[in-house]
Every structure is written in C-alpha cells, then in structure tokens.
From Swiss-Prot:
One GO cellular component, as annotated: nucleus
Top-level taxon of the source organism: Eukaryota
Record's protein name: Cyclin-dependent kinase 7
Family that this chain belongs to: Belongs to the protein kinase superfamily. CMGC Ser/Thr protein kinase family. CDC2/CDKX subfamily.
Pfam families assigned: Pkinase
Keyword annotations from UniProtKB, A to Z: ATP-binding, Cell cycle, Cell division, Kinase, Meiosis, Nucleotide-binding, Nucleus, Phosphoprotein, Serine/threonine-protein kinase, Transferase
Origin organism lineage: Eukaryota, Amoebozoa, Evosea, Eumycetozoa, Dictyostelia
Organism of provenance: Dictyostelium discoideum
Residue stretches making up the Protein kinase domain: 4-288
Length: 360
C-alpha cells in the first residue's frame, strides 16, 4: 500500500470497492480494487470469494493489449488488493451518449479490438461468459479492453459442465437459455453479435425481461429454432417449442450497414453454436479488409462527460512523463561526469619506458 497514493473512490462492485490511485514512483494513475474478505457461502477458508480468485488467476495468465492489465496484487490489513491500469469509460457510455455519432469506421475499430481480446481468451482456453458494453472498457489512448472476468471459466476438458446462468440476459446465447450445461466459445461470439447490433442500432438488440421473454425476442428477430436449423435443440434440458416465426432480414434492420457487416453479424448470430464463426475467423472476415478503414483508437469518440477530465489526465500524464525523462537524463549526465572525473589508469608499459629513459 505504501507504493500508492489513494485519491478517490470511483466505483463499487460485487466483491469490493474500486479507488483511483497514483503510483508514487512513476506518477502512473491506476485503479485499485479492494476485495472484501467476509466469510460467506462460496468462499475459501480465507474469506475470499472463489470468483475473485478465479478472476485473479485468469488475468495473471492473460496478457493482451485488449484485455485489462492486472499490474499488481498485494495484501494489506487482511484485505486483498488488485491494481489495474485505470480505464476512462466503457462502451455503454459511448453507445448511450447521443452527442456522439458513430461512424462505420468507429464501429469497425471497436469490433476489431473486441474480437482481438476474445480471440486471445479463446486461444488460452478461457470463456469470458459476460460480454456486454459496460464490461468493455476504454483506455486513455482509446484502446478497448475486456474486463470483469468474475464469470470467466477455463474450458476444454471433456464432459466439463458449466452453469447456464451466465451472461447478462440481453447477450445470453439461446443454448444457455435452453439450459445447456456443456458449451464453448460460441457463447461469447453470440454476445459479440448482440454488441455489434447494439453499436449499429444504439440500443440493445434483444432486450428481454426474463429468460422466456428473451427467447421470444430472439425468435421474433431471428426466426424459430428447430431440428432443421439447430440439430439437437429439442433435447436441451429447458427446451420450449415456440410458434414458428420468420426471421427479420438483417439488411431490413441495419439499413446503413455494408454487405460485409451484414454477413459477419449473420455468422455470429446463428442458432447452432457449432456453426457460429470463431473469433479468429471473424478477424479474417472481409468486413475488416474492405470498405472504410477502421478508426485509429486514439481518434475514437469520447463521451461528452469525460472530455474535460480526459484532457486534464492527458496533460498530467504528459507532465509526469516529461519529469521522468528529465530525471533519467540527469542520472545519465551524473554517471557520465563520474566516469570522466575518474583518473585514467597508469599503463605499465609507459612506466617502464619512463624509467628506462631516466636511466639513460
């Protein structure tokens, strides 16, 4: 704790509070999450929630530009503290800010960073299981990073089962709504498809009020799942037969979207999980190589409420970096002066030559 100056409380989560702090040695602004240690159900003997431990383990192993960076872990007064890079806002704030006009190039940039982050997770056998706009955080440089790995799980073991009660309901895949306990990375891809739609619509695509209503919303938008378009669906534990309903063509809903964007989202929002596109294949989709080039992250729009504080933080960061650079230069100059002030060693050959000359 001595390494940090705690400045202000900035949030509170399920397992603790989050404060803004500064690293004393460097001036770096960070976020410190304090994990509460209270002995309740589903916790270790030390009183730390299993989800918090799982999040720590996963973030220690996952190092990627589009995954939030866990910088430090320490204990203080019987509490555990996680130190993260400070993120400025989340994607939900961008979507809801009506002063922002999201251009196709902006959406492409968000989607590219989101897919890069989840591809890194899946490559390391991690399911996020709770992708939604307010879990996608933005850095001071405009980089999108996946956060909140409290529901994340390692996958890949044969017959491994999970709870279907994962993922916020707007972004929950149909196999989870039907009670599947064995599933894979396709649940994250479904969530990303819903986020893609939300970026284009500026409102949640499938805003259900409960599991049954969520399934109704899905059927209304995408048609009705059956053994023809999803073999095995009728065998899922909580399968319910819905009235046959035709799908609404994506082009009819996303009128301004390119053909490539329509094709990509249609491959993400397929009923059959086995047929959904993978994150790696999505990154190689023509959507990212055709049409407008994605916006540079540093040029992405900033929520109106964050502009003033962001400018101030960038100025402070620039000043701190300048001070650190000057300090390094001074240290280098001092080292050079010390080297120059040291007397040159006397060469033995020169001494012998001088003695011989004196004898002559």
């Amino acid at each position: 704790m001595d390494k940090y100056n705690i400045e202000a409380l900035i949030g509170e989560g399920t397992y603790g509070v989050v404060s803004r702090a500064t690293v004393k040695a460097t001036g770096q602004i960070v976020a410190i999450k304090k994990i509460r240690k209270i002995l309740i159900q589903n916790q270790t003997d030390d009183g730390i929630n299993f989800s918090a431990i799982r999040e720590i383990k996963i973030l220690q192993e996952l190092k990627h530009d589009n995954v939030v960076n866990l910088l430090d872990i320490f204990a203080h007064k019987s509490n555990v503290y996680l130190v993260f890079e400070l993120m400025q806002w989340d994607l939900q704030e961008v979507i809801e800010d009506k002063s922002i006009i999201l251009k196709p190039a902006d959406i492409k940039s968000y989607m590219k960073m989101l897919l890069q982050g989840i591809e890194a997770c899946h490559r390391n056998w991690v399911l996020h299981r709770d992708l939604k706009p307010n879990n996608l955080l933005m850095s001071i440089n405009g980089d999108l990073k996946l956060a909140d790995f409290g529901l994340a799980r390692q996958y890949g073991s044969p017959n491994k089962v999970f709870s279907p009660q994962a993922v916020t309901i707007f972004y929950r895949a149909p196999e989870l709504l039907f009670g599947a306990k064995s599933y894979g990375p396709s649940v994250d891809i479904w969530s990303i498809g819903c986020i893609f739609a939300e970026l284009m619509l500026r409102t949640p695509y499938l805003p259900g009020t409960g599991e049954i209503d969520q399934l109704r919303k899905i059927c209304s938008a995408l048609g009705t799942p059956n053994e023809s378009n999803w073999p095995g669906v009728t065998c899922l534990p909580n399968y319910i037969k819905f009235t046959d309903h035709p799908a609404t063509p994506f082009k009819q809903l996303f009128t301004a979207a390119s053909d490539e964007a329509i094709d990509l989202i249609s491959k993400m929002l397929l009923f059959n999980p086995s047929n959904r596109i993978s994150a790696a294949d999505a990154l190689n989709h023509p959507y990212f190589t055709s049409g407008v080039k994605h916006t540079n992250p540093a040029d992405l729009p900033v929520p109106f409420a964050k502009k003033a504080s962001l400018l101030q933080q960038r100025q402070v960061l620039a000043q701190v970096q300048q001070q650190l650079l000057q300090k390094q230069q001074q240290q280098q100059q001092q080292q050079q002066q010390q080297i120059q002030s040291q007397p040159e060693p006397i060469q033995v050959d020169n001494v012998e030559q001088t003695q011989q000359a004196q004898q002559v």
